[in-house]
């Protein structure tokens, strides 16, 4: 048995002590986690800057602050979330009462990506702790400084058999995903998600897969162009475009395309200044592999660049870039971009825009900028997507009352707030039947009972 397998079985053994099922224990662990995150704030911010070039305002808002809010909400609501529910019982089961009890799955695996390497570890972990599970965490090896901070934070806060961090790369991940966990929560690319899903199926392990895809932005002829440009630029270029729900491409009505490009270009200068490479507010690409993938896409679209296009390998810097005259068969439209390159396509009618999106895999997010209520209702009702926003981008993630998750190729399962608790919770149903009375209609011998059975099931 290798060390990873040993840690797994130690975690299973800890769960079997029943400690984690106590509600006061769970609340105390969440309190300890909040305190630890606050004490590690400067280390977390420094690691995020080193690995991704994240400005501390952006890093705190998208990684630390939102996590602390989530912990606070879970501690506040936990008593209600964990209540056993008494549900209605049909008359033909008299004298019986029916219940749904919330219980933890057991030992869960959380695999996190590099783009929000702190938040995307702890958001699912909050749900796992709140639900009463033990957990093993696999942070991204592409953000090693953040991973080391997470390991120190967890090791100093929790019993290693309760919450454990496994650092490493592909080999360690392969070992983990083939173990018989009680639940696997994965955030990352579609290709890796398929590998995780296949491995989990060997042990019939339930999974949540949070992936991505090409999330579109529709800008129609009624849109407030200034507002649209600001909110699209925020959503696309935060974290240098390395956000799973970032706008991947724009579908703009042909009558307002030029106005939108002008507004986007102006907004980018307002956000990051004339020399964007010198801006303290603009991030960097996580590593050279992803940098070269993105510059290859840029090189294939040199004739389409209307803003940006510059890059610097030494800094892993890619300038925010706008591409015009893009078509559906362009190289940039064949994969999720996951970087600061924004293709712009046009449409003539809403029917055309809806058909374009219908022809592609269901996106993780979709955004519409419009003042037309009919257009809004058509997009919401006719298109399938994980989540989204009307006249905004990204911000649907900030509401813990909303579930977040994909559909189709963009993922399965949902989390955030109570939905995180539900994800890591098995709803166990049972009945309690009195021994004082037995009608006996369902028991042999059946002679003379047919009319009573029909009466019980009468519609």
Description of each model-found segment:
Residues 15, 19, 34-37, 41, ...:
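Structural signal for hydrophobic packing residues in well-ordered secondary-structure cores
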Residues 21-25, 218, 317-459:
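Conserved C-terminal structural/oligomerization subdomain of aldehyde/semialdehyde dehydrogenase
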Residues 26, 71, 132, 163, ...:
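Residue-level signal for inorganic ion chemistry
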Residues 191-327, 390, 448, 455-458:
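ALDH superfamily catalytic-core signature
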Residues 1-99:
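N-terminal Rossmann-like NAD(P)+-binding subdomain of aldehyde/semialdehyde dehydrogenases
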Residues 32, 162, 182-184, 342, ...:
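Short active-site oxyanion
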Residues 91-227:
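Rossmann-like NAD(P) dinucleotide-binding subdomain of oxidoreductase/dehydrogenase enzymes
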């Amino acid at each position: 048995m290798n060390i990873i397998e040993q840690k797994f079985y130690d975690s299973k053994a800890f769960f079997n002590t029943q400690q984690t099922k106590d509600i006061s224990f769970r609340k105390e662990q969440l309190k300890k986690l909040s305190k630890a995150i606050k004490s590690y704030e400067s280390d977390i911010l420094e690691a995020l800057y080193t690995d991704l070039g994240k400005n501390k305002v952006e890093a705190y808002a998208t990684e630390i602050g939102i996590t602390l809010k989530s912990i606070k909400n879970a501690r506040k609501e936990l008593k209600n979330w964990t209540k056993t529910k008494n549900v209605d019982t049909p008359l033909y089961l008299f004298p019986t009462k029916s219940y749904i009890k919330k219980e933890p799955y057991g030992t869960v695996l959380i695999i996190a990506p590099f783009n929000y390497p702190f938040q995307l570890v702890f958001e699912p972990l909050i749900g796992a702790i709140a639900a009463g599970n033990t957990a093993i965490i696999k942070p991204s090896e592409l953000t090693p400084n953040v991973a080391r901070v997470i390991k120190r934070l967890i090791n100093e806060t929790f019993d290693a058999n309760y919450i454990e961090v496994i650092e490493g790369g592909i080999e360690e991940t392969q070992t983990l995903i083939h173990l018989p966990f009680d639940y696997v929560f994965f955030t990352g690319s579609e290709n890796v998600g398929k590998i995780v899903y296949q491995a989990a199926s060997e042990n019939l392990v339930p999974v949540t897969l949070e992936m991505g895809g090409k999330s579109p932005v529709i800008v129609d002829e009624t849109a407030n162009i200034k507002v649209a440009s600001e909110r699209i630029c925020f959503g696309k270029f935060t974290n240098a475009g390395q956000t799973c729900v970032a706008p991947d491409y724009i579908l703009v009505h042909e009558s307002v395309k030029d106005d939108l490009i002008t507004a986007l270009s102006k907004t980018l200068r307002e956000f990051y200044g004339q020399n964007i490479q010198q801006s303290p507010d603009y991030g960097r690409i996580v590593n050279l592999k992803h940098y070269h993938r993105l510059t290859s896409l840029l090189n294939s679209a040199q004739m389409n660049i209307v803003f940006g296009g510059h890059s610097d390998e030494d800094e892993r810097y890619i300038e925010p870039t706008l591409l015009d005259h893009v078509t559906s068969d362009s190289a940039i439209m064949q994969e999720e971009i996951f970087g600061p390159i924004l293709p712009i396509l046009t449409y003539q009618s809403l029917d055309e825009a809806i058909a374009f999106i219908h022809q592609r895999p269901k996106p993780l997010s979709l955004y519409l900028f419009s003042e037309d209520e009919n257009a809004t209702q058509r997009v919401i009702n006719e298109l399938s997507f994980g989540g989204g926003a009307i006249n905004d981008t990204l911000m649907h993630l900030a509401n813990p009352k909303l579930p977040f998750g994909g559909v189709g190729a963009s993922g399965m399962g949902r989390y955030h707030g109570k939905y995180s608790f539900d994800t890591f919770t098995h709803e166990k149903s049972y009945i309690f039947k009195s021994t004082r009375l037995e009608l006996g209609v369902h028991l042999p011998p059946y002679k003379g009972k047919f009319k009573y059975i029909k009466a019980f099931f009468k519609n």
